[in-house]
Amino acid sequence: MDLSGIFKYYCKECENTWNNSSVELFEDIETYSKDSQKKREKELDKFINTISVHLERYPSDAVLRKMWVKKGEVFLQKTLEKENIFKLEKMDVEDRKKFLDITKQFIRDARKFDDDLPIGDIMQAMRNVWISNALQLLFGKEIYYSKANFAYSMLYPYTDNYLDNTNIDKNDKILFNNWLEKRLLGEHIKSKDYHESKVSQMIDYIESVYPREKFTQVYESLLLIFKSQVNSLKQHGKENHLCKEDLLSISIEKGGSSVLVDGYLISGFMTKEEIESVSYTHLRAHETRHDL
């Protein structure tokens, strides 16, 4: 199966769907006032800030550390169960418990992997774990969490955010992209610094779950999101004046390839129908967020 060709076809279909969609809202769609949006944003900011402060107070004493862990998990569970933030009441009891357990485990794993990673970056990566869990339910699978889910989600702060950082020299980004492309292609290439070593370690995690020789399309999908991230750099800089059509194309390819990888990391394979479903799942999320 020509994954790149199929993906580009569905991206074009998504563009056509977007361009031909009505600007009128459905009568039964749930809407939120600006005041309601601001209230929810404040609640989420407070949630992230509380977690950040709690993580910074990591005690050295073993007894106090157990109490610290318990307190953090109780707070996290109560907050995630609040209907006005995450709407977990739509899940059955067993799936909700798995969702909460995965959320707590991911935060623990992220802290263990890189204790210096800002809480905002951890929460950004956490959102992708949630997307992965949602796709598992969509595909009729059980909610689960693996090294591959962890690694791909954690790649966001180390790759996408790195490329988006305007304080990093353009030449450094080019060198990093050259290195990363070779690493994604399976070359045994050395890491030249701490940043690259962390990225390489996460790719190692994916390879441990999905060996390259058996799951080739997992790595084809990773190359697609990589190329989409690089292509999205065209949106940066005052000298780049992209037309609306190009911005739409870049946004759909980047978002679509991101969810495509999530789909492949569920079991290592996807049918053409599942690829189509994933592509349109992204578009519906894209429409809901009003990114454009």
Give residue ranges: language-model regions.
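Intrinsically disordered, low-structural-confidence terminal and linker regions
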Residues: 1-32
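Alpha-helical phosphate/pyrophosphate-handling elements in metalloenzyme active cores
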Residues: 47, 51-53, 58, 74, ...
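Low-complexity, highly charged intrinsically disordered N-terminal segments
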Residues: 71-91
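Aspartate-rich (DDxxD/NDxxD/DxxxD) Mg2+/diphosphate-binding motifs
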Residues: 136, 156, 160-185
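Inter-helical turn/loop segments and adjacent helix faces that build the functional surface
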Residues: 138-139, 165-169, 209-216, 240-241, ...
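Divalent-cation-assisted or electrostatically stabilized phosphate/pyrophosphate-binding catalytic cores
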Residues: 173-204, 243-251
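Acidic/His metal-coordination segments adjacent to aromatic residues that form catalytic metal sites
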Residues: 231-246
